[in-house]
């Protein structure tokens, strides 16, 4: 494996390297592929192998556990990764055989052409041009359009297999009653299916309750779905700023995010070379990529919001759609009459996109061009199958401002815009807050379902308190777990650097793991079928002191092993029936196992064994004189 580019070495398309750590399989795991109805539907999953349980009757087999895998080919040792060439175009044949797209002879965006013709960018540019597709004249190429016509696409079948996580392999094993046991959940009206079928995926997309972000110009992406009747997903934000980061850094963050479980990635770059950075990320990403196009549009007018125009924004949308961006955050709900409502707030308008559009509205004293040109935007979206992520530009930036008039006025508008997008068969999800105390979170979910007609909700946290800079991944994960339980379909992660600085690769991992916990906790609370299998497997391994299995089944095997080995580094300690927390004499699980072993030896129940043990101790106390404190 080649060494990553040094921070001191200038990035070029000759020396671009993948992060070595990102291509290592996770411990005791292997990539497997489940074939669908056709040979080119190969759905990736991670198989975690477990060791046997030692019993008095010999070894007891523990089955492998299958988990959702977002890492793409990076963790497949049989795949050669070279980020200079990008990933294989998995969906290219599916897109081509539908016959409703055409290959463009050139780029449609004037800005893209300008960047392509700039010789100064030659060494920085991703140098393998993928063919650029566009819908044939009059065609609509969205997954929603196909679903509404009753078509089950290969993407939909792929998703159904992926969501089921090969659960039938565990469910069919009668010996695995422990693994299959699951507490009933409370789904708050969600339609949770025992098994996900391609027909169910199609129907959820058709009615707008779920989206499949899958731009026809991002054939490298492995299909996934966002909707409250499916597994809760998480998004990772990356991106450079005017003050730091590079293309190499951002590609590393993307590969690191998907390794640990990021279902989608948003490139929020606001610094140099946004266009080139995004191309490298998309060509190497197996997960959907989202952006906020107004950020780049603002750079094109040197940061002067009042100089933005519809024409500049339109060209930016086309530029990014032809690169392969899968969903756009567009703050079309920031309307002129709503801006005065924010005057009474503690923290005003905290959304970057929201503040840009608010400034434009005030400078021109007009409705936002995002709002007035919304149907024009829909025409662009359906020509490439880009999904809307309707931005919450007026989200609360403090607990003080939670659930106020401005926030909910915008939410109603987003519901109106959703209906317009659906008339064009364009897929939509709705962005949500923000900073909200725990007792006000449920209202956000209820009103979103009401105003936005059950379109998927995508929330940033929410942060449940404002007093913990440096720990906002925790303050927000509390709210994320709650709102995920209530029905949010995707959670946008928050890193420990939130409000403080640009996250690095380690911060990305911390944010991902924290939000994987929140999303999984929500799946458990909803009663999502099979959600508890991994918990049960890890608990069984913990009780049986199978330390390596505990590490391998965890969300972060490396950290679990590192913490254990800080005090018990010897390899033999991974076979010990205790850890450094309680030591050998006070381990509750060891004591329970001793009781079970004694009961088995004596041919009695565990209850009787405990009673006999109590009686022996009572006799021992009396025989020693019945003194509360014995003299040495």
Curated annotation (Swiss-Prot):
Residues at which Zn(2+) binds: 435, 499
- Coiled-coil features, chain-numbered ranges: none
Q: What enzyme class is recorded for this protein?
A: lyase
Can you state which reaction this protein catalyses? 5-amino-1-(5-phospho-beta-D-ribosyl)imidazole + S-adenosyl-L-methionine = 4-amino-2-methyl-5-(phosphooxymethyl)pyrimidine + CO + 5'-deoxyadenosine + formate + L-methionine + 3 H(+)
User: Organism's domain of life?
Assistant: Bacteria
The record's Gene Ontology cellular component field reads: cytosol
UniProt-recorded name of the protein: Phosphomethylpyrimidine synthase
How far does the signal peptide extend, from start to end residue? Answer: none
Q: Organism source for this protein? A: Nitrosomonas europaea (strain ATCC 19718 / CIP 103999 / KCTC 2705 / NBRC 14298)
Q: What is its EC number?
A: 4.1.99.17
- Cell cycle keyword on record: no
> Of which family is this protein a member?
Belongs to the ThiC family.
Q: Which InterPro entries does this UniProt record tie to the protein?
A: ThiC, ThiC-associated_dom, ThiC/Bza_core_dom, ThiC/BzaA/B
GO molecular function of the protein, one example?
A: carbon-carbon lyase activity
Record keywords:
4Fe-4S, Iron, Iron-sulfur, Lyase, Metal-binding, S-adenosyl-L-methionine, Thiamine biosynthesis, Zinc
